[in-house]
Amino acid sequence: MARVLLTCFFILISSHLGKSSGVFELKVLSFTSTSSVCKGSSDCQIFFRVCLKHSQALILPEPPCTYGTGMSEILSADSISSSAYISVPFNFKWPGIVSLIIETWNAETSDQSTENNNNMISRLATKRRLAISEDWSQDVHLGRQSQLRFSYRVVCDEFYHGEECSDFCRPRNDTFGHFNCDAAGNRICLPGWKGDYCTEPICLSGCSEENGYCEAPGECKCRIGWEGPLCDECTRHPGCLHGTCNQPFQCTCKEGWGGLFCNEDLNFCTNHKPCRNDATCTNTGQGSYTCICKPGFSGKNCEIETNECDSNPCKNGGSCNDQENDYTCTCPQGFYGKNCEVSAMTCADGPCFNGGTCMEKGSGSYSCRCPPGYMGSNCEKKIDRCSSDPCANGGQCLDLGNKATCRCRPGFTGSRCETNIDDCSSNPCQNAGTCVDGINGYTCTCTLGFSGKDCRVRSDACSFMPCQNGGTCYTHFSGPVCQCPAGFMGTQCEYKQKPTPVNSPALPAALIVSFTLGLITLTLVICAAIVVLRQMRQNHKASSTTVRNNLDSVNNRISLSPTSPLGREKEAFLIPGGPFKVSNKDMALRSTSVDTHSSDKSNYKQKMVDYNLSIDEKHTNNKLEKNSESTLLVPPLNYPKEGVYHPVYIIPEHIEQRVFATEV
C-alpha cells in the first residue's frame, strides 16, 4: 500500500514540475485628467483595464491578450489612489519580457463595457522587462488629457519559485518526503533524511551499508546473517559454541576445539588451565588431562599443599616449622644442621670438609664457609642440583656446576620442560580433519572419505563395510549404506527376510457381473453358430441324396437292345470314343415338364441323334483339355409324358482321368 501511495505522490510531483503559477499585479497610484474627459458629469466614474501580450516590436492593442487581462473596480475619478488594484494570474513559465497595455475607460453604466471606443480616456502600450520580484516598480504615463502614475510587479504563487515560477516546492514531513524549501525552491532535507525527495533515512553512523538498513533516522537494522550494533558481525551457525565466522552461518573452531559445533575440547589444559600452584598440565585425550605437581603439593589439580613436618624431619629434639615448599628445624643446644642431626663442635676439631673454612661463633659453635660446589653444615655434601628433579616430563638434568640445565624430551619445551609443544598449531590435518594434540605428535580424526595421518588420502567408505548377499554399497554423509536385494535386510544385508504372504485382493462386484454376462453372451453365440452349421449340413446332405437317388434310378434301368429306340437313347448317356462313363457323382438329373401332347417317335429319335452328335462334337474338342474345367450342357428334350426317361444335365467339375464302372 505504501508503495502505491509513493507512486501516486511521484506522479503528483511530476505534474507540478510541469506546471507554473504566478500573478502580475498593478496598482494605480493616481490618475488626473482634464474636465472635458467626463463630459460635465458631476460624478465621473472610470475603470482601468490591463492587457498582457507576448513581446511585439509593434504593439497592437487589439485582442487577444495572449498572457491574460484584468480590470479594476469602477472608481470615482477624483478619488483614485492605491485602491485601484488589478491582478492578472498566469499558469505558464513567466517569459520575462511582455507587452503591457493599460487602458482608462469612462464607465457610463455599472457595466464595465469596452465595446465603445469613444469611452476610452487613455491608453498606454509599452514593452517591459519584468523579473520575478517582491518589489514594486513605479512608472508614470503622461497623455494628452491625463496623467497616470502606477506601480507593478510579478510574483509567484505559494510553493512556486524560480525566475519563471516553474519550480514547485511545498514543505512536508510525511511518508512522501521530509523537507523544507528555500527561497529558490530547492528542497532542504530535514535532519536525518536524504535523497531527491528526502525519503531515504540516514542510518546510524557506521552502520554497514551492505549488511544493514534503516527505516527511520538513526536506526541500524541487520539483514539475515549479520548482527551487532553496526551489523558488521556475521552470525555464527546455530549451536556453535567455541567457534568464529567470516561469513554468515559459519562455525570455524578456535584453537583446542573441534567438532561440527566446536563443542569438543581437544586441548583441555589450554582452555581451562586446571592445574594449580604452577603445576605442569598434560593433555591425555579428549577432555582429559594430568597435572604434574611441584614439591609440596598434591591432588588431581595439585590443589592440596603438603605439610613437610608430617614426616618429622628434625632430629635430636628439634622442632619443625612448616613453610611454603620447605621447613626449618629449631635445634636444641649442642645441635645444628638442617635436621639438627649434627652435634656441636669447635673449629679446633676441623669439622669443615672439602676445603671449607671454619668460623667460630660466640655461642661456642662454628660455621663452615663452603667452596663452590659443596654444601652442608660441614661442607660435606657436594651440591647436586639435579637431585630435586627439576626437569619435568622426563627431561634430563645436566649439572653444570653453578647451575643445572634440562634437556627436554621431544615434544616438550621450557626451562624445566614443563610445556607440551602444541603439534596442532600448524593445522596439519587436511580436508576438514580434526587435530588432537599428543606428546611429540598429533592424531587426525578424518572426515568421511579421507584417511591417512594427515587425512590427505581419499578412501572409499564402502571398503570398510562390505555388503553381503549381493547388496550394493553407497557412500552417505553419515557413512556407508547398503541397499539390500529382495529378501534380505540389515546394515550389511546379513539377515534373511521372511516372505510376506500376499493376500489376493477381492475382485470388485462389477467385474464379476461383467464377466458373467460376457460368458453367457459368448455361450449363446456359440450355440447359435452350431445350430446354423447343422442346418446347412442337413440341407446339403438332403440335396446330395436326392441327386444320387435320381442317378441310381436311371442307371439301374433294364438293359435294352442297341437297335431299339430305347437302346439308342441309353447310349446317349455314354461318352463316345472312349472307355469312360458318366458316373452318378458327375451327373445331376433334373426333371422337366414333358409336353402333354404326344410326338411321334421319329421326332423323338431325331432329337436323340442330335443330342448324340452334340456330345461327340463336344467330347472331341475337349480331348486336348483333360485337366481343365468344362461344362457340357445337354439341352432339355421333350419326352413323352408317359416316357420312362428324363433329361440329364452335367454339373461343371474338374475332370480327372478315372475309370467309372456302373452296373446296369
Curated annotation (Swiss-Prot):
Gene Ontology BP terms: arterial endothelial cell differentiation; blood vessel morphogenesis; dorsal aorta development; hematopoietic progenitor cell differentiation; hematopoietic stem cell differentiation; negative regulation of Notch signaling pathway; neuron development; Notch signaling pathway
Domain DSL positions: 154-198
PANTHER family reported in the protein's UniProt record: CYTOCHROME C OXIDASE POLYPEPTIDE VIC-2, UNINFLATABLE, ISOFORM C
Signal peptide positions (record): 1-20
Keyword Acetylation (UniProt): no
Annotated protein name in UniProt: Delta-like protein C
Record topological domains on the Extracellular side: 21-511
Residues bearing glycans: N173
Described purpose of this protein according to its UniProt entry: Acts as a ligand for Notch receptors and is involved in somitogenesis. Can activate Notch receptors. Required in somite segmentation to keep the oscillations of neighboring presomitic mesoderm cells synchronized.
Taxon lineage: Eukaryota, Metazoa, Chordata, Craniata, Vertebrata
An MF annotation (GO) of this entry: calcium ion binding
Source species of the chain: Danio rerio
EGF-like domain segment(s): 199-232, 233-263, 265-303, 305-341, 343-380, 382-418, 420-456, 458-494
